[in-house]
A protein has these predicted regions:
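Hydrophobic Val/Ile/Leu positions in short beta-strands of Rossmann-like dinucleotide-binding domains
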Residues: 138-141
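Hydrophobic/small residue at the entry helix of a nucleotide-binding pocket
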Residues: 146
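NAD(P)-binding Rossmann-fold cofactor-contacting core
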Residues: 92, 155-177
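Glycine/serine-rich phosphate-binding loop and adjoining beta1-alpha1 elements at the start
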Residues: 2-134
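A short helix->loop->beta-strand "cap" motif at the edges of active sites that frequently abuts
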Residues: 3, 60, 85-87, 158-159, ...
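Adenosine-phosphate binding glycine-rich loop
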Residues: 88-127, 230-339, 344
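ADP-ribose/adenylate-binding Rossmann-like module
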Residues: 35-39, 52-71, 200, 209-251, ...
Length: 352
């Protein structure tokens, strides 16, 4: 049947992008797919709002989906909790073969490389930025897999890391990993580089952005729309001045032009907006995870709701990757006992 592609056939004006995206998303659903592989759950949510007729429960063809990202799984969890999710959706993002490689290693590496490259330009130097990562104070917001990866790679290049994390256990983990852990109010004023790795709307709102010193650099790792609250700054009269491609200075209207902070990639995910994206070795694992998710959706009827991949699904992807990379897993079988204990539970040190 060939492959239907819902995208412009030629270069388009930036002003037309949002309109075209909406039209193509609607066209993709009206094409009547039976399965979706989504990124951000935007198509899934569109099918549950403006295009409910495409859902199988309403007589349409769409009967299941798989979701790639943390930012997509979160709204799906809310939909499931409210009883609004009318499809079975597999959270490919939560599989170890996706989260522990694409999120942690791939995004961590690509974001740090992207930030370092963007700041190693003559325009950045003219704006008061010293190139390099070594010795700089990096503040990483969020210590999930992406934040952990960003902190690890930046630290490997010699950055001093402060982690801002609301979860006390994760904040403690950051300290045990050799970083500092502090509140937003304490961390931001001393930051050279601030990386938001939360995937949460308005993680850096206007109040937080006012804490930044002049020429502090702000970037988003991975990310969602409006993770940096630029809409709040515009409402307060702040202005953006372009310094170079993917580098803008944001200042209050009544300030001098060198007082504001520097924003990378317009507040979008810096690794895929202004750089090369994640390494293919990590992305291969994500795509393979999506493939086994589709295979399961084709072969098994699941109830509407959010589902996780099975350990066997993860193992299938991992073994294929090991073979491709020239490695292997230990072939010895586990005990087969529930819990995996090597001996019968009746065997203990105090037995008579």
């Amino acid at each position: 049947r060939g492959c239907a592609v819902f995208a412009p056939q030629q270069e388009t004006a930036a002003a037309d992008t949002e309109t075209l995206d909406r039209e193509h998303a609607a066209a993709a659903l009206e094409w009547a797919p039976t399965l979706l592989v989504d990124d951000g759950a935007h198509l899934i949510r569109l099918a549950h709002t403006e295009h409910q007729s495409v859902l199988s429960v309403n007589g349409g063809e769409l009967r299941a989906a798989s979701e790639e990202t943390t930012s997509g799984v979160r709204p799906l969890e809310e939909m499931a909790a409210l009883g609004a999710l009318q499809l079975p959706v597999l959270a490919a993002n939560d599989a170890r073969t996706k989260r522990d490689f694409d999120n942690l290693i791939g995004t961590g590496q690509s974001c740090v490389f992207a930030i370092a490259d963007l700041l190693d330009r003559d325009e950045a130097a003219a704006a008061g930025i010293t190139a390099g990562v070594h010795g700089k104070r990096w503040v990483v917001l969020g210590y999930g897999p992406v934040g952990f990866g960003v902190a690890r790679f930046a630290s490997a290049f010699g950055a001093r890391i402060t982690v801002v994390e609301r979860d006390a256990v994760r904040a403690l983990a950051a300290m045990h990993d050799g970083h500092e852990a502090a509140s937003l109010e304490l961390a931001l004023p001393d930051a050279d580089v601030v990386v938001s790795a939360t995937g949460v709307w308005h993680t850096l709102n206007a109040e937080a952005l006012r804490l930044l010193r002049p020429s502090a650099v702000v970037a988003v790792a991975g990310g969602i729309d409006d993770e940096v609250g630029l809409d709040e700054l515009l409402a307060l009269g702040w202005e953006a001045t372009g310094i170079a491609e993917h580098l803008d200075r944001w200042c209050p209207a009544d300030s001098s032009r060198d007082e504001g902070f520097l924003l990378l990639a317009g507040g979008g995910g810096v690794n895929y907006t202004a750089a090369e994206g994640n390494p293919i070795e990590a992305m291969d694992l994500s795509f393979a995870t999506q493939l086994v998710a589709l295979d399961r959706l084709v072969g098994q009827e699941l109830a509407p709701g959010l589902h996780r991949l099975r350990v066997a699904d993860e193992d299938r992807v991992a073994r294929a990757a090991l073979a491709a990379f020239g490695g292997s897993a230990d072939p010895r079988a586990e005990s087969g006992r529930p819990g995996g204990a090597a001996q019968d539970w009746r065997v203990h040190r105090y037995r008579a």
